């Protein structure tokens, strides 16, 4: 990626005028036959949801971990194949105009557990996998930055983009309104309890026969809210209820895949990688029973072993505690073991994702079955 620094005063709070001028200049300097362009300018510090509320119908991405920078996105400037070489090729043909200390551009992606799994409702809108660069990306930590990506050939509609910038800036400066009181919800469709019981018994039988070591069963449930609460309202409630979890969302048309997860599949910073096994659950007040349970311990260890096995080809060292700890969430307790490693050579994070996803914590052993 070709980076171009731009003079941006970082003393004090960023101003609309200075950031708008930088954006306007970068757009004006881009020719009709120019490469892809990403412009990153300082922005007001606000919750990542503030960008999404500026244009709710254009929301595309939210990534909001509890202890590091959050990102949100509007629109899709570029869809990429979920592969390391596709990402590298795109950024090699991209100019990045940014101020000092600005974050690097970021793409966002996701993948189903198995090829073809997205052929059925409710996953049809999302496909088996995706990788995208939002048109507008808001990065927020101690500082905040707003990025615009222009990837279409030909001259861009600069006046329209600047109008959108003004609307976004106004949303970032306004506090998010008070969320209404909790509303009731009712289930209108869920798996038959008898069929569910039969499925669980079948799983237990196959484990006894040695076909599987671990299986995570799942149920489909449709819930209807009594009010017209939207996806952004649900995400705000998740933030309030599960502050230690990562909020994430992907919008596609009228559909939204969203949640708040305590799990970390993989994090890579330089040559250091971090994963964790989060398997084994119980209610509050029952931690001692969970930690003493041979069943919970054995199933947890299957997840630890799978993560170690997946990372071993890439790492020259791996370490994890001998004993798991208890991870406390507002509604449940989990057994947790962090796994740290050091890469023997530079490795793209997508290769690590491919080696681990899905872990037995959310799937089973053996995974391919």
Residue ranges and their predicted role:
Residues 33-40, 57-64, 106-108, 213-215, ...:
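A short, Trp-centered hydrophobic/proline-enriched beta-strand micro-motif
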Residues 65-68, 74-78, 219-302, 313-318:
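An anion-binding catalytic pocket shared by soluble metabolic enzymes
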Residues 339-369:
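Conserved hydrophobic core element of enzyme catalytic domains
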Residues 2, 6, 88-220, 314-316:
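Non-catalytic accessory segments adjacent to catalytic cores
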Residues 202, 206, 237-241, 306-314, ...:
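Generic, well-ordered alpha-helical scaffold segments in large soluble proteins
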Residues 225-230, 329-333, 365:
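Short glycine/threonine-rich loop-to-helix capping motif typified by GTGT followed
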Residues 1-34, 142-172, 260, 264-338:
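Cytosolic ligand/metal-binding cores
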Residues 1-81:
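An N-terminal JmjN-like helical accessory module and its immediate linker preceding a catalytic domain
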């Amino acid at each position: 990626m070709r980076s171009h620094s731009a003079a941006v005063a970082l003393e004090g709070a960023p101003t609309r005028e200075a950031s708008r001028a930088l954006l306007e200049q970068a757009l004006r300097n881009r020719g009709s036959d120019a490469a892809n362009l990403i412009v990153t300018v300082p922005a007001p510090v606000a919750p990542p949801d503030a960008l999404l509320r500026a244009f709710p119908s254009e929301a595309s991405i939210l990534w909001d971990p509890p202890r590091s920078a959050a990102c949100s996105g509007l629109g899709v400037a570029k869809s990429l194949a979920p592969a390391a070489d596709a990402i590298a090729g795109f950024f090699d043909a991209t100019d990045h105009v940014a101020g000092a200390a600005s974050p690097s551009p970021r793409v966002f992606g996701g993948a189903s557990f198995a090829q073809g799994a997205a052929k059925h409702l409710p996953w049809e809108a999302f496909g088996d996998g995706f990788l995208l660069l939002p048109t507008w990306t808001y990065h927020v930590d101690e500082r905040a930055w707003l990025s615009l990506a222009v990837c279409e050939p030909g001259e861009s509609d600069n006046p329209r983009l600047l109008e959108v910038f003004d609307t976004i800036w106004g949303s970032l400066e306004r506090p998010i309104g008070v969320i209404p009181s909790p509303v009731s919800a009712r289930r209108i469709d869920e798996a038959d309890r008898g069929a569910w019981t039969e499925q669980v018994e079948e799983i237990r039988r196959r484990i006894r026969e040695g076909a599987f070591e671990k299986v995570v069963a799942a149920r489909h449930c449709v819930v209807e809210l009594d009010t017209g609460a939207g996806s952004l309202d649900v995400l705000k409630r998740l933030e309030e209820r599960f502050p230690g979890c990562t909020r994430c969302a992907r919008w596609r048309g009228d559909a939204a895949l969203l949640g708040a997860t305590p799990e970390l599949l993989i994090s890579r910073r330089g040559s250091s990688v971090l994963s964790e096994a989060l398997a084994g659950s119980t209610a509050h007040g029952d931690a001692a029973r969970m930690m003493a349970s041979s069943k919970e311990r054995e199933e947890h260890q299957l997840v630890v072993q799978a993560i170690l096995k997946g990372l071993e080809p890439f790492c020259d060292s791996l370490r994890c505690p001998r004993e798991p700890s208890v991870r406390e969430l507002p509604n449940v307790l989990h057994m947790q073991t962090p796994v740290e490693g050091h890469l023997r050579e530079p490795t793209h994070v997508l290769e690590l994702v491919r080696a681990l996803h899905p872990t037995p914590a959310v799937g089973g052993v053996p995974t391919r079955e």
